[in-house]
């Protein structure tokens, strides 16, 4: 996302090439995901259910190739956003980092960027308000990270395109979560690629008339031209609209006295019984206070408590550090 922001400021011909996800983690006969697995193992370690040696062994089994995390976390989400914005060649989002097709994608992208320079196909000719709305809907369909909201807002700001939380709420209402990936579901990015990758998701959204099919992409073709014939090879990894992972896929925007300008929630990864919940607020004034107190056995907290972390936004801390897990 930072590279896209820089490219947007320059408004030059640009093409995105992601590094690709790691291979699936394999540990003691089970498939384990990177971020999702780490948080569970960390909780088990702190609870005394596993030893530190067990933790390290699982971590080694989890990160067994180069590439970014293979769950639908920030990296996989933003790779999907780049492709759905039209800023990368088809399949860029999901090809594993060590797959030969990842290198082919990079080679073809290198050839294509030379042609884009000759065609003067600059970024502002590709990314529009419509392509942002396409990406928001794709984020819902893949169960994408809440981090997409701040990254997409920053890219839109550089391009002087008005993108608000209201757009996320409006566009997200129409889309169920179709992609059955951790942390919302079962599978990982390697499985997603073999099942058809992002083109298969885009095709399903196009079939329902949910995307602006005429949105332009970096190869000079439209989203519809690139993806309308894409095939899904595994309906459990990429679900149909008749059998979604969750019916409410889009990012939800919450407003109230605690967050008058809006707070966001990823319904596909949320526990259904917490959608309406009342509990005691346990407030931490800083990340440092949170880390110092969260494992204190004397902390007045239980399973119904609501943890509130202050002074941890993109400006104040800075960087909006991830500590919620």
Please describe what each predicted stretch is.
Residues 2-4:
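Short beta-alpha junctions and helix-cap segments that line functional grooves
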Residues 6-11, 17, 21-325:
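Catalytic or ion-coupling anion/metal-binding cores of large enzyme and transporter domains
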């Amino acid at each position: 996302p930072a590279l896209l922001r820089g490219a947007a400021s320059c408004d030059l011909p640009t093409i995105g090439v992601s590094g690709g996800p790691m291979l699936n983690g394999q540990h003691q006969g089970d498939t384990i995901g990177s971020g999702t697995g780490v948080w569970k193992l960390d909780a088990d370690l702190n609870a005394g259910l596993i030893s530190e040696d067990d933790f390290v062994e699982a971590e080694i089994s989890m990160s067994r190739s180069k590439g970014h995390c293979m769950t639908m976390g920030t990296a996989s989400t933003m790779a999907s956003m780049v492709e759905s914005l039209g800023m990368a060649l088809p399949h860029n989002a999901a090809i594993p980092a060590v797959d030969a097709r990842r290198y082919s994608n990079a080679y073809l992208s290198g050839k294509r960027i030379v042609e884009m320079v000759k065609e003067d196909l600059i970024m502002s000719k590709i990314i529009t308000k419509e392509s942002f709305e396409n990406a928001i809907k794709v984020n819902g369909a893949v169960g994408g990270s809440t981090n997409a909201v701040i990254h997409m807002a920053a890219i839109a700001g550089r391009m002087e395109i008005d993108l608000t939380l209201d757009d996320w709420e409006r566009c997200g209402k129409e889309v169920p979560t179709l992609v059955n990936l951790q942390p919302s579901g079962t599978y990982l990015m390697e499985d997603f690629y073999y099942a058809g990758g992002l083109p298969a998701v885009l095709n399903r959204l196009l079939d329902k008339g949910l995307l602006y099919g005429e949105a332009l992409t970096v190869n000079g073709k439209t989203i519809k031209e690139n993806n309308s014939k894409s095939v899904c090879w595994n309906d459990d990894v990429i679900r149909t609209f008749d059998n979604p992972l969750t019916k409410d896929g889009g990012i939800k925007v919450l407003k109230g006295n605690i967050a008058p300008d809006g707070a966001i929630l990823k319904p596909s990864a949320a526990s259904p019984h917490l959608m309406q919940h009342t509990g005691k607020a346990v407030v931490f004034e800083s990340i440092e206070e949170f880390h110092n107190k969260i494992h204190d056995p004397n902390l007045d907290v239980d399973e119904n408590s609501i943890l509130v972390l202050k002074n941890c936004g993109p400006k104040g801390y800075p960087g909006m550090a991830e500590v919620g897990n």
